A protein has these predicted regions:
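Terminal helix/beta-alpha structural elements that buttress the NAD(P)+-binding lobe
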Residues: 1-24, 31-63, 73-77, 81-93, ...
């Protein structure tokens, strides 16, 4: 099969031939039909953490072509008859029901940390069966490819870290979840019972668009009114004011007075904020629009130097989306330890999507070519801290990104067998 392989020494990646992978216990072999690009993919190709030979890339969508053997019958450790085990059995039942020929989407951690796990930018991938979700018939492979990583990033920040009501059940009795609820109750503002105000910096980013939708789902489930405020380029305002985002107030992020305008629109400050950019001075500025007891989530780590801590008034809550994979993650000399609760949260979220959780995918910019064009075009367009966004290209597909997801179609050439799930 063809795959996009990291060349760490030269800070790039190239398409190479690799053997077809084999699914292990509780894993699926998936023929990739589309991949979506995230800034982290470009960042850690041009500024490598992984070693040469790793498959890069995160988001994928495709067809299941084979299943690995079932897990041993012992199941989960420390299983109890509580609601936790019921939820786990539900997620396990979903993963067991996914069969050859099903359309699924998911994400992997490709060359974004110090490990040997392969990524998604390949003709075939192997993924745990409980970390994919069924693509509804109304959604294309190209649309679905851009959902998994960014939507989970949004959900983790909102429900696991900020403590908003989730529109799906997860391990609410885990130690981490209980601590989050206690923190939320301690910091709760009396006005929260009537209306909560929520601010998104970067409302037209991929993560930001899922944040808005999930905030609306949360408010509906909890029976609350929500005042949704955001910053974005004015050319995206009409889209963001319409459903499913339905922003009440939008401001231009380039207007230096936007924090003052947000405080005015929220009558003194917001209850919650989500910084979907989290770089340089954005975290400081977002922290100034929180009311007393307000909380904010960020998508990048201050310890890794993504943003400046000076002047930040409220300690932001950070976590890596990779926590959902249930594996130890090491990058920037930090270790993000595996967490059963965070893995359970991810599987519950993807089960919700499979069961019909209604999220509108980001608008897609379908890029020409396939794997061979990702570095040359897609990564150049995304840019990184090492490679600035290319403004010199004049092709239509290379225009600046705004409110879109970059997606490539992948054509798998190898055939697969049938019946027993083994590769032909």
């Amino acid at each position: 099969m063809k795959a996009l392989i990291l060349d760490a020494e030269n800070k790039t990646a190239s398409v190479q031939e690799l053997p077809l992978p084999s699914p292990g216990p509780n894993e699926l072999l998936i023929a990739v039909k589309a991949v979506a690009l995230n800034p982290v993919d470009a960042l850690y190709t041009f500024n490598p953490l992984g070693s040469t030979g790793r498959i890069v890339g995160s988001d994928f969508a495709g067809l299941v072509v084979a299943r690995g053997p079932p897990l041993p019958s012992s199941g989960y450790q420390n299983e109890t008859p509580s609601g936790i085990s019921s939820l786990r059995r539900s997620s396990t039942a979903l993963s067991a029901s996914i069969n050859r020929g099903d359309r699924v989407a998911g994400f992997l951690q490709g060359a974004c940390s110090v490990n040997i796990r392969p990524g998604a930018f390949a003709e075939y991938v192997v993924c745990p069966s409980d970390l994919v979700w069924r693509i509804p018939g109304t959604m294309t492979f190209e649309e679905a490819a851009g959902v998994s990583l960014c939507a989970l990033t949004a959900a983790q920040g909102l429900f696991f870290r900020l403590g908003l009501d989730a529109p799906f059940q997860w391990d609410v009795d885990s130690e981490e979840a209980v601590l989050r609820r206690v923190e939320s109750e301690i910091s709760r503002d009396p006005g929260d019972d009537d209306e909560l105000s929520f601010f998104v910096f970067g409302a037209s980013t991929s993560v930001g668009m899922y944040v808005a939708q999930l905030v609306r789902h949360s408010a509906e489930m909890g029976g609350k009114r929500v005042k949704l405020i955001g910053t974005a380029n004015p050319r995206n305002w009409d889209k963001l004011k319409a459903k499913p985002y339905a922003y009440d107030h939008l401001f231009d992020y380039r207007d230096a007075t936007w924090p003052e305008k947000v405080r005015e629109a929220s009558e003194g400050g917001v209850h919650f904020a989500y910084d979907a950019i989290s770089e340089a001075l954005t975290v400081r500025d977002v922290s100034t629009i929180l009311r007393e007891g307000g909380k904010m989530a960020v998508v990048r780590s201050g310890e890794a130097g993504a943003w400046h801590a000076e002047g930040v008034r409220t300690k932001p809550i950070y976590g890596a989306v990779w926590e959902g994979l249930g594996e130890d993650v090491e990058y920037h000399n930090m270790l993000v330890s595996s967490s059963p609760a965070k893995r359970s949260f991810a599987t519950a979220f993807y089960k919700w999507l499979s069961d019909g959780g209604l999220l509108q995918p980001n608008p897609v910019r379908l890029m020409p070519g396939g794997l061979e064009k990702i570095v040359e075009d897609g990564f150049a367009l995304l840019g990184t801290n090492v490679t600035n966004r290319d403004q010199s290209r004049t092709e239509d597909h290379m225009k600046p990104i705004s409110g879109e997801k970059l997606v490539y179609k992948i054509d798998t050439e190898k055939g697969v067998g049938s019946g027993d799930g083994h590769i032909a």
